[in-house]
């Protein structure tokens, strides 16, 4: 779950946001302006918005008769996980799928957003350095925050973990305070002040803020600010390392968690099939060649792994990739066997055949207009198209024993990646991926996209991670949470060493920042063309902007509270909830009556 709570939003504002920027299933929560202490859940249902009142009894939160929860967060999480449970009074199912988030209150990396006290304690105690701190959202009081600090005292006696102190940070009238007379304009000002003075507890003991615990999660729409933060040098005089170095080093230290078996690649009969002796596929995710003689050891082996986008749910049709090493003379036939059995129609090659005099990949296709047999398959090069950044080959593949069964395969070779480092700017890579995705989307029954470079981990990992993040943002919206470090960890759990260098790590950030900036501009143009009263459902978005919507900000409103609809949960009695309308909404087109 992410930051779906909007402190200063009226019902009319919520309706405007959800209609103008949301998609079906987008939702947000806000304080009730009718009943102090209660909350409202506003949900986009088709082209309309439903407002659901949430009761805060003082002991629990519920939907006036639904399940009861200790916190607002638990209530929202329950109904997002239990799809189909919420119904409108006319039986229309209400889906909570995509949170419409507020901006982060700060771009500082010590802000972790949505995090429980237990999760904060686990992180800080694992760090083990007294006076390490972070700031997170308050789950018990939405709109407030918590400063979690690792003390220098054990929690329960000698040998036990250090105690974590949680200090509530209240946001009152747009100012921040931990209580007392001191108030601050921003969270950053508050933290900077108490880094200098410490915080005195009621007992008289002091809590100090000495070492921030940095987050890698970021609101996608705020990634440009995060890039600026990561480019800053450390404050200490003995080092000039920037945040990108810190994050990448932290990622490298976590590589020990991915020590999965790689026994197949180590077999003597398979050693000649590996371009580099220590870059081997994990057994649990390796591509197994089908139809091979089981009596021949290693005959089903190829140095390639399936890579699944686990950022999206099973109902969101996330792409699957195959990450492979570049072909050797001994593996070309196996490569075409893999492409055929997986029904892959798009191959992405991110290297030249030779770079700086070194062989990177054996050409596994014939010259233009030529046909060649590779094992049991015939491959014909029907044509090549050169662009500034890449070359596109159209290949036809068929089994030698069935020439009438022909598949067309599009081979995209990126030619502008420098021999060392990364491209100077990401525009070429983003355009390249846009063409690839348009092709893949035009082939509804196509199998995984095959991506390879030379070793199949550096450029290959970089391209796959960028594409995964773009797909995630395009599905969930520009204000969704992304975590580049954790995304790479997820990919590395499927193939070892994906994303090899700090430069590649930073390039992913820069590429996603440019993708978001470009998408924002395209979305603004589309919205201006449709006019302010436009409905998302009437807009045809480009593939890379599917479901994209702009970020909501924490803005106050003078509007009054508006419509609530009677609502019930399945197997619960229908509650009678009186509709509340402001005078200017009496004849609003926002009525939720369904046809």
UniProtKB/Swiss-Prot annotation:
Q: Which InterPro entries match?
A: Non-rcpt_Tyr_Phosphatase, Prot-tyrosine_phosphatase-like, PTP_cat, SH2, SH2_dom_sf, Tyr_Pase_AS, Tyr_Pase_cat, Tyr_Pase_dom
Which EC number(s) does UniProt give?
3.1.3.48
Q: Which residues carry this modification: Phosphothreonine?
A: 394
Task: Describe the location of the SH2 domain by residue ranges.
Answer: 4-100, 110-213
| All copies of domain Tyrosine-protein phosphatase, residue ranges | 244-515
Q: Would you kindly state one Gene Ontology biological process term found in this protein's UniProt entry?
A: regulation of ERK1 and ERK2 cascade
The record's account of how the chain is modified after translation:
Phosphorylated on tyrosine residues. Binding of KITLG/SCF to KIT increases tyrosine phosphorylation. Phosphorylation at Tyr-564 by LYN enhances phosphatase activity. Phosphorylation at Thr-394 by TAOK3 leads to polyubiquitination and subsequent proteasomal degradation. Ubiquitinated after phosphorylation by TAOK3. Ubiquitinated by a cooperation between ITCH and WWP2 via 'Lys-27'-mediated polyubiquitin chains resulting in the reduction of its association with LCK.
Cross-linked residues, Glycyl lysine isopeptide (Lys-Gly) (interchain with G-Cter in ubiquitin): 308
| Residues holding substrate | 419, 453-459, 500
Locate the Phosphoserine modifications and list their residues: 10, 57
Q: Tell me the active site.
A: 453 (phosphocysteine intermediate)
Task: List the catalytic activities from the record.
Answer: O-phospho-L-tyrosyl-[protein] + H2O = L-tyrosyl-[protein] + phosphate
Q: Where is this region: Disordered?
A: 535-595
* Location of Phosphotyrosine modifications: 64, 377, 536, 564
Question: Where located?
Answer: Cytoplasm; Nucleus
Q: Which GO terms describe its cellular component?
A: alpha-beta T cell receptor complex; cell-cell junction; cytoplasm; cytosol; extracellular exosome; extracellular region; membrane; nucleolus
Query: How is expression of this protein distributed across tissues?
Result: Isoform 1 is expressed in hematopoietic cells. Isoform 2 is expressed in non-hematopoietic cells.
List the keywords (alphabetical). Answer: Cytoplasm, Hydrolase, Isopeptide bond, Nucleus, Phosphoprotein, Protein phosphatase, Repeat, SH2 domain, Ubl conjugation
Comment block on domains: The N-terminal SH2 domain functions as an auto-inhibitory domain, blocking the catalytic domain in the ligand-free close conformation.
Q: Which family does it belong to?
A: Belongs to the protein-tyrosine phosphatase family. Non-receptor class 2 subfamily.
Purpose of the protein: Tyrosine phosphatase enzyme that plays important roles in controlling immune signaling pathways and fundamental physiological processes such as hematopoiesis. Dephosphorylates and negatively regulate several receptor tyrosine kinases (RTKs) such as EGFR, PDGFR and FGFR, thereby modulating their signaling activities.
Protein name per its UniProtKB record: Tyrosine-protein phosphatase non-receptor type 6
Q: Which organism is it from?
A: Homo sapiens
Gene name on record? PTPN6
